[in-house]
């Protein structure tokens, strides 16, 4: 199938199964956080996964290439991003296993059956409305700041849509870790696994990967840190493995 690119769009190679993704650099492009989340999340054979705030569909497409899950759905509120995601799915001939739904995370309980997903992933906006400078480009601002949804919205939605024993995987920023752990527990999502991501071995962490289980027992494993760069411009071997180079 021939997929036509619109003005400003480009095809980017995902280094996985020959998959490519349509993006518009002037709007928003996926970052390393999404790729790391796709490597951290686990989807078993036969399981159904949902990505909240999927953007251009990077996480469902990567998870389709990395796991044996049955079906992957991406939920995205921005019409332009959802359109790019749908066309990327068609370009990669994944329409039988990946679907994109345009809609609001806060209304996901009306879009999907409750307790219907085995796995939910999310790479939500990191910054609260009053934290940091809001990007003047609205698509970028929505992706980075809690303009259309909050951490509470994301975690509350995950609780509603996960089956009992279902898993929630999220990437976020360490400065909000205490708040994240409290909200997860409040919504019966027990933190089970955590990994801090450091840009360099001698720097502070700038990302945190978290796995929580709906209705799980209290016990969390802190995995060894993930170091992104061995030196400037040279990825750590683990990063190359996650990207699939």
Q: Can you say where each PLM-predicted feature lies in the sequence?
A:
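Conserved SAM/SAH cofactor-binding pocket of Class I
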Residues: 42-133, 156
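Mobile active-site "lid"/loop adjacent to the S-adenosyl-L-methionine
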Residues: 124-153
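Conserved Class I SAM-dependent methyltransferase catalytic core
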Residues: 148-199, 203-205
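SAM/dcSAM-binding transferase cores
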Residues: 204-245
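Residue-level signal for inorganic ion chemistry
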Residues: 37, 123, 154, 212
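General small-molecule cofactor/ligand-binding pocket signal
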Residues: 22, 99-101, 192-195
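A generic structural signal for alpha->beta connector loops
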Residues: 18, 46, 69, 95-97, ...
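Class I SAM-dependent transferase core
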Residues: 2-45
């Amino acid at each position: 199938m021939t997929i036509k690119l619109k003005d400003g769009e480009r095809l980017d190679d995902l280094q996985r199964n020959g998959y490519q993704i349509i993006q518009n650099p002037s709007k928003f492009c996926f970052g390393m956080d999404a790729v790391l989340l796709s490597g951290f999340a686990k989807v078993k054979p036969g399981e159904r996964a949902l990505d909240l705030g999927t953007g251009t569909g990077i996480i469902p497409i990567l998870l389709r290439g990395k796991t044996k899950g049955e079906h992957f759905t991406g939920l995205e509120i921005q019409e332009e991003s959802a359109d790019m995601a749908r066309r990327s799915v068609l370009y990669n001939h994944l329409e039988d296993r990946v679907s994109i739904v345009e809609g609001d995370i806060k209304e996901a309980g009306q879009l999907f059956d409750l307790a219907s997903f085995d796995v939910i992933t999310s790479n939500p906006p990191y910054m609260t409305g009053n934290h940091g400078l809001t990007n003047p480009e609205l698509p970028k601002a929505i992706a980075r700041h809690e303009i259309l949804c909050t951490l509470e919205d994301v975690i509350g939605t995950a609780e509603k849509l996960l089956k009992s024993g279902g898993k929630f995987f999220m990437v976020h920023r360490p400065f909000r870790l205490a708040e994240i752990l409290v909200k997860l527990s409040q919504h019966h999502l027990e933190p089970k696994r955590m990994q801090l991501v450091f840009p360099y071995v001698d720097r502070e962490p700038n990302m945190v990967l978290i796995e929580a289980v709906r209705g799980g027992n209290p016990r969390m494993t802190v995995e060894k840190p993930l170091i992104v760069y061995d030196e400037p411009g040279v990825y750590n071997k683990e990063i190359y493995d996650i990207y699939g180079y």
